[in-house]
Amino acid sequence: MPAQVAVSAPYYSLGMAANRPPARARARPGSLERPINARLYRGTWLLVGIPLLIAAFSVGKPTALRAAVPTLPPAFDKARATALARDLAQTFPDRSPGSPGAVSARQWFADQVAKIGLRVRREPFTATIPGRGRIQLENLIVTIPGRSPQALAVLAHLDNIGTGPGANDNASGVAALIELARSYASVSGSPPPGASIVSPAHTLFFVATDGGEFGGLGADKFAADFRDRLVTAVALDSIAGHGTARLVIAGNTARQAAPGLVETTAARIQEQAGALPRRPSAFAQLLDLAFPFTLYEQGPVLTHGVGALTITTAGDRGPPPFADTPQRLNGGRLAQIGRSAQELLRALDQGAELVQGTSSYVYLGARVIRGWAIELVLIAALLPFIIAAVDLFARCRRRHLPIAPALRSYRSRLLFWLWVGLVFEVFALAGVWPTGAALPLSPHSSAAHHWPLLGLFGLGALAALGWIVTRSRLAPRRAVGIDEELAGHTAALLALGVVGLLVVATNPFALLIVLPSLHAWLWLPQVQSRPLWVRAAVYAAGFLGPVIVLISFAARYGLGLDAPWYLAELVAVRFVSIPVFVIGLTWLAVAGQLGALTVGRYAPYPSADERRLGPIRSALRAAVLAQRTRRRTVSDERQRAAGG
């Protein structure tokens, strides 16, 4: 019997060991270590399929307008236009706003227009240019009366940056403007050679704008004054370069010219140049909708609800000022685009109402995807994050995790960033930063490259003061449990969801910038127990959207390392609106809380028992106690003296 026991005992132990559940290699889904419902997150991505299908059915091919009646061959004179451009660039190399050369150049334009029997109407105005101050500017308008008061406009900025002759940018556009006006001079006087003998259906405005190099100040003023009459507008800028023609369709808002206007312009250029003009890539178009920005004059016109585009041979930034000499003008390209603009104007005169207005879209080859369909896809891409974040919050509530201290911790970080934003805005009002109209700054200007170090030092000092006050509530004082860390993640993700909804309310296309942070940072609670480098990689992925915007400005506009300051300047001049600025600060507060969790420096907002006096109250308490001590010492000395 003892032998049987000796045999059965090991057998029994082995059997129990065989039936024991295996140790888990990873945490159970739904636990504190793996709180994100990955299955729910993956499943909600199926919701994006329906908007994608709708977007596919929204793809269409816009059609171009053609002139309703036969027209004469284009009468644009290549030699005369090239001579005008060279004369303007050589005689007035400095046409920067407010300079004597700008005044003389305006008189030169008026004289050239007078030679073809037309008159110029002067429209003076003032504007503040960052780095230059308040300056007197003037638009020059040549009007060709039509059978309708509704108007078409051709714009070309007369000014330049002042550091080069500005032959291509934009003496070429001004020369083409004069040649285009010449072909309609018969309507207002004796026709010069090559002039049209047909009165236009629409009133025509040929506008030499001022301040075009500084955000399109003149175009903005003209569009504001004539928005009720304008049907559409075309800007000519740097059209005598050696590159092929290019269409700039982006605006300063998430609106573009109607696709029919773009197609009509492209068709007229193809007829004269033998090739279609270049357009931005699909990714660049999406980025321009997410962060609307352009240096060309169609931008402010589109802001006023008037369809407009720019024809150019330059890039996003324009030609380098020092190399923009009369000797480098391409007369052949100037003639091609000039004749294209002439035929475009005739086509628009017959049917501009069919291509007026603004819309949003993205070109894919010869076809376009409608903006509303893209917005629908982007909003649908927000849903997986929202649903997963709400599910995480519900799980935390069921576990009775301390969400309130985590929300208060986020509130403290948000107040810190709002303090930094308030100081920045106060400095802007005080003139510490260069200020001006709410338009893009010239990348060539000193304001775009000069960092006001003294002002930035003051901003940093006041920000540090705000952080010292805030840090007393955020510094870890004890070991933080995994439940408190999860609550901190949940509070930050809820705030991030609010940021996403606010972006939808302002500009749904801007979700392109925010979505990487939403979908990357959602998984930070899931990797909280992983090594630091894993957490840091997931955290860094959330900055992909803002980094792409920063790189885009640095590369496309030649800003390089000055791109961060340039973006800050856009905030200072209110090109970036206050609501968008506040949304950005809210996003930074989320990044701050998640960053603290990533590196293990997070602490929930302290309870009343844990709370210490802040630095200000501590200093006041120390001062009061010191004053009481001094008074007590003086009183004791007086009593001893009286007793002695």
Q: Residue locations for each model-derived region?
A:
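N-terminal Lys/Arg-rich, disordered targeting/topogenic segments
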Residues: A6-P35, V624-G643
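Soluble extramembrane regions of membrane proteins in the secretory/endomembrane system
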Residues: P62-Y361
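His/Asp/Glu-rich mid-to-C-terminal helical/loop segments that flank catalytic regions of hydrolases
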Residues: T313-I386, A572-V573, I578-V580, G584-P604
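Short, Lys/Arg-rich N-terminal segment immediately upstream of the first membrane anchor
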Residues: A27-Y41, P405-Y410
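Hydrophobic membrane-insertion alpha-helices, especially the h-region
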Residues: R42-S58
